[in-house]
UniProtKB/Swiss-Prot annotation:
The active site is at H251 (proton donor). Disruption phenotype: Mice hearts develop less dilation and dysfunction when exposed to sustained pressure overload. This is High affinity cGMP-specific 3',5'-cyclic phosphodiesterase 9A. The gene is Pde9a. Keywords: Cell membrane, Cell projection, cGMP, Cytoplasm, Endoplasmic reticulum, Golgi apparatus, Hydrolase, Magnesium, Membrane, Metal-binding, Phosphoprotein, Zinc. The keyword Zinc applies. It holds the Pfam family PDEase_I. Highly expressed in kidney. Lower levels in liver, lung and brain. Widely expressed in brain, with highest expression in cerebellar Purkinje cells. Present in heart (at protein level). PROSITE patterns: PDEASE_I_1, PDEASE_I_2. Its cofactor is Zn(2+); Mg(2+). Specifically hydrolyzes the second messenger cGMP, which is a key regulator of many important physiological processes. Highly specific: compared to other members of the cyclic nucleotide phosphodiesterase family, has the highest affinity and selectivity for cGMP. Specifically regulates natriuretic-peptide-dependent cGMP signaling in heart, acting as a regulator of cardiac hypertrophy in myocytes and muscle. Does not regulate nitric oxide-dependent cGMP in heart.
Length: 534
């Protein structure tokens, strides 16, 4: 304790009272008035009596906390001091002065205490800072060790494969263990209403806002309630899904949101909750969110022709769609992201099988096969038949996956530019690697109009016409925009063709003028040398 405790040690003064030695003890924080009162009480004098202290050689001693200490052998003598009678005014002044002096004394004592407390706090803060630095270092070490373990695990599980390219990125699969920090946006009634319609403008929203919209859909459809989904786990899962979509021009997280929002709007538009079980709705929504996870931006044709790791792994059978499924269930396998944690094992098996079936159905190579099967069932469609329902769910996710042209033109058309950009990136790479190039992906052969007309005419319209037979409401809301979109691109193609024809004529006239002039000069010379017969 040392110096810290010595400052609080009381002071002892010895008084000689009629030959009797009286010891008086007081703290250094007492003021002069308190000490004088204490001496008066010790000598039997009335309080407030003015007294003086004398040493053994009759020298006067100042009565205050700093007065010199003495011993039993050298006690101070106490002498009352005779004072004149003072007026009431003087007594009042003296009282006020005494109070002021006492306040000053207290103020000085408070300042001293403040200084001591401040010094003590400074010492504690320094200690906390040092301890905090230790914690930071420990956490950094833990993080480094965790990264090293993950890298070692990835290396141990990696198979040596003679593939040309690998698109896997296992680092993304590690979910965030803390509660996701993206802001929880409070959706306005107008946004909630618009979110249920196919006309929703998906370009107006930032990623955090799209995450909040997806979270709202699960609550609004009753999925969080019916399957006891932990809201924090739902947010963490959505954030992990977001992190596992790549920044491709087309196949990115916004496309994921676009497809899921269209599925959500079809649930409300077609009254699907009356036709399907809640588990079916959960499968439809979750498959839509996961259907393009970790898409590398190069389609199945490229994967197969380039003999990539995905093509080899899945034996050229829907390599991308199989990869999307695998990533989806790797994320769900993490306890922190398992939104199906409360679902019984048999229920989870059904959900898993349903999601795999729907995601694999998005492979456009299977389009004709799925459409033919669905048309067969349409003749006697039975909602109680599980096979019929499965085919309908496959058609629904296919509709949502390629539904951009269902939206208003100002929302749909930018997606065409995004898709063509991704196509051109692939065709450029295929040319550089000596691989086959599809004409509809070649930047030298395709235009926006030619890319869309055939797709709308032979894929989109027939598929949505089939769905309209089950849900007539689809015709006005979804089929009519497709007809209008087809007309728009046909007009655009006519304009493109007219411009090309005009360009050809201009080039022909420009390149043919010198030749025609030469021929005319030659004819004139010939006519001069050969006169026509009479």
């Amino acid at each position: 304790m040392g110096a810290g405790s010595s400052s609080y040690r009381p002071k002892a003064i010895y008084l000689d009272i009629d030959g009797r030695i009286q010891k008086v003890v007081f703290s250094k924080y007492c003021n002069s008035s308190d000490i004088m009162d204490l001496f008066c009480i010790a000598t039997g004098l009335p309080r407030n009596t003015t007294i003086s202290l004398l040493t053994t050689d009759d020298a006067m001693v100042s009565i205050d906390p700093t007065m010199p200490a003495n011993s039993e052998r050298t006690p101070y003598k106490v002498r009352p001091v005779a004072v004149k009678q003072v007026s009431e005014r003087e007594e009042l002044i003296q009282g006020v002065l005494a109070q002021v002096a006492e306040q000053f004394s207290r103020a000085f004592k408070i300042n001293e205490l403040k200084a001591e407390v401040a010094n003590h706090l400074a010492v504690l803060e320094k200690r906390v800072e040092l301890e905090g630095l230790k914690v930071v270092e420990i956490e950094k070490c833990k993080s480094d060790i965790k990264k090293m373990r993950e890298e070692l695990a990835a290396r141990n599980s990696r198979t040596n494969c003679p593939c040309k390219y690998s698109f896997l990125d296992n680092k993304k699969l590690t979910p965030r263990r803390d509660v996701p920090t993206y802001p929880k946006y409070l959706l306005s009634p107008e946004t909630i209403e618009a979110l249920r319609k196919p006309t929703f403008d998906v370009w107006l929203w930032e990623p955090n806002e799209m995450l909040s919209c997806l979270e709202h859909m699960y609550h609004d459809l009753g999925l969080v309630r019916d399957f006891s989904i932990n809201p924090i786990t739902l947010r963490r899962w959505l954030l992990c899904v977001h992190d596992n979509y790549r920044n491709n021009p087309f196949h990115n997280f916004r496309h994921c949101f676009c497809v899921t929002q269209m599925m959500y709007s079809m649930v409300w538009l077609c009254g699907l909750q009356e036709k399907f079980s809640q588990m079916d709705i959960l499968v439809l929504m979750t498959a839509a969110i996961c259907h393009d996870l970790d898409h590398p931006g190069y389609n199945n044709t490229y994967q197969i022709n380039a003999r990539t790791e995905l093509a080899v792994r899945y034996n050229d059978i829907s390599p991308l769609e199989n990869h999307h499924c695998a990533i989806a269930f790797q994320i769900l396998a993490r306890p922190e992201c398992n939104i199906f944690a409360s679902v019984p094992p048999e229920g989870f098996r059904q959900i898993r099988q349903g999601m795999i079936t729907l995601i694999l159905a998005t492979d456009m190579a299977r389009h004709a096969e799925i459409m033919d099967s669905f048309k067969e069932k349409m003749e006697n469609f039975d909602y109680s038949n599980e096979e019929h329902l499965t085919l309908l769910k496959m058609i629904l996710i296919k509709c949502c996956d390629i539904s951009n042209e269902v939206r208003p033109m100002e929302v749909a058309e930018p997606w065409v530019d995004c898709l063509l950009e991704e196509y051109f990136m692939q065709s450029d790479r295929e040319k550089s690697e000596g691989l086959p190039v599809a004409p509809f992906m070649d930047r030298d052969k395709v235009t926006k109009a030619t890319a869309q007309i055939g797709f709308i005419k032979f894929v989109l319209i027939p598929m949505f016409e089939t769905v309209t037979k089950l849900f007539p409401v689809v015709e006005e809301t979804m089929l009519r925009p497709l007809w209008e979109s087809r007309e728009h691109y046909e007009e655009l193609k006519q304009l493109d063709d007219a411009m090309k024809e005009l360009q050809k004529k201009t080039e022909s006239l420009t390149s043919g003028a010198p030749e025609n002039t030469t021929e005319k000069n030659r004819d004139a010379k010939d006519s001069e040398g050969h006169s026509p017969p009479n």
